[in-house]
Amino acid sequence: MADLAAGVAERGPRLSLWSSLDQRLVWVVAATALLGLVMVASASISMAEQATGDPFYFFKRQIFFALLGLGMALALLQIPLATWERAGPGLLLGALALLVLVLIPGVGREVNGAVRWIPLGVFNLQVAEVVKVLLALYLAGFLVRRQQQLRTSMAAFLVPVLVSAACAFLLLLQPDFGTALMLMALAVGLLYLAGAPLWRFAALVGVLAAAAAALVVYSPYRWQRVTAFMDPWSDPFNTGFQLTQSLIAIGRGDWLGVGLGGSVQKLFYLPEAHTDFVFSVLAEELGWLGVLAVVLLFSYIVWRAMAVGWQCHRHRLPFAGYLAWAVGLALGLQAFINMGVATGLLPTKGLTLPLFSYGGSSALATGAMVGLLLRCGYELAQARAEGRRPEEAAS
C-alpha cells in the first residue's frame, strides 16, 4: 500500500477533465460556431422560404446539426487517446469501407452528378467528412510507430502516402477532387512536421503537383473550372457564374458591409449561399472587418492546435502531438481553400467552411476534431500535473 501511495504521489494529482480544458480555445470555437449559425440563418432565409415556406428551416436544422457536433465533441473528449492509437488500422479499414460503400448503386445518393452521400434519414452523411477524421487518427498512430524509420526507410515514408492516395483515388471516383487534394496535403504536411528528409518531401510534392495538374488537364470539367477561375468575367453567366457572383458580394461589402441580413447576392444570385459560399455572404453583410474577424478566429484555432502539438511532443506524447497537428492542418487547409475559392484565389472546389457552412456531416466532423484537440490538450495538462518535464529540461 505504501508503494502504491508513493506511486500516486509521484505521478501527481488526477486533473478534472472540465477544469483543465483549454478555456480560450473553447470560447473561440464557440464564438466561431455562433457566428456561423447567424450567417447560415441570414444566407439561407430566402431559399428556405421558397423551398419550404419556413424562412428559418435551414437555420433550425443547423442548430440541430450544431448540437450533434457538440455531442460528438463531448463524447470524444471522454475517450483516452490511447484507444484511438490502438484502433488506427481498424479506423483505416473503416474509412476505406465507407469510400467503397458510397459508390455501390442504391447505397450512395447522387446530387448534381456526384455520389458523395449515404442517406441516414435525418441527414445525408458525406463520407469524405468522416474519412478526413479517420485518416488523421490513422496517420498520427502510424507516425508514432514508424517515427525513427521515417527518416531512414523509404517504405516507412511511402506507406502514409499510399494510404492517403488510396483514399484520394476513391474520392475521385465520386468525384470529389477538392477533398482528395486536401487529404494528400494533410499527409504531406504531417510527413514534413514528422521530420521526413527534405529531398523526399520535395520529390513527393513534385509528384503530387504533376498528378494534380494531369487530373485537371485531362478532365474537361476540371479544366473548365480552371479557365473560369483565370478569367471568370469572360463567361460570367455560365462557367464563371459562381465566382463572379461571389466577387460581386465581396465587393459590395466594402469595409463595413451592408448590414446583417442586407445581402442582395443571397437572393438567388449566388449559388450555394448557405453552404460553399457562406463566406461571401458574410463579406457582403459584415464587410472586410467581418472577414478579418473570421480569419483571426481560424488563425487562432490553427495556431493553438499547432502549439498544443508541439508541447505534446516536448512532453513525450507523440500521438497527441501528431493528432493535434493533423486537426490544425485539416481545419486550416479547409478554411483556407474555402475562403480562397470565395475570393478568387483558388479554383472552385466545393469544400465547406468549418463551423460556418450548413450541413450535418461538416458539423459532426468539425465537432469530432475539436473534441480530439481538446483531449490532446487535457492529456498534455495531465502530463504536466504528473511532473513530466519537457525533453530539453529532462536532459
From Swiss-Prot:
GO biological process, any: cell wall organization
The keyword Transcription regulation belongs to this UniProt entry's keyword annotation: no
Periplasmic topology ranges: 46-62, 108-116, 174-178, 222-276, 338-352
Its membrane topology: Multi-pass membrane protein
Subcellular location(s) per record: Cell inner membrane
Source species: Halorhodospira halophila (strain DSM 244 / SL1)
Protein name: Probable peptidoglycan glycosyltransferase FtsW
GO cellular component: cell division site; plasma membrane
Superkingdom of source: Bacteria
Catalytic reaction annotation: [GlcNAc-(1->4)-Mur2Ac(oyl-L-Ala-gamma-D-Glu-L-Lys-D-Ala-D-Ala)](n)-di-trans,octa-cis-undecaprenyl diphosphate + beta-D-GlcNAc-(1->4)-Mur2Ac(oyl-L-Ala-gamma-D-Glu-L-Lys-D-Ala-D-Ala)-di-trans,octa-cis-undecaprenyl diphosphate = [GlcNAc-(1->4)-Mur2Ac(oyl-L-Ala-gamma-D-Glu-L-Lys-D-Ala-D-Ala)](n+1)-di-trans,octa-cis-undecaprenyl diphosphate + di-trans,octa-cis-undecaprenyl diphosphate + H(+)
Record's signal peptide: none
GO terms, molecular function: lipid-linked peptidoglycan transporter activity; peptidoglycan glycosyltransferase activity
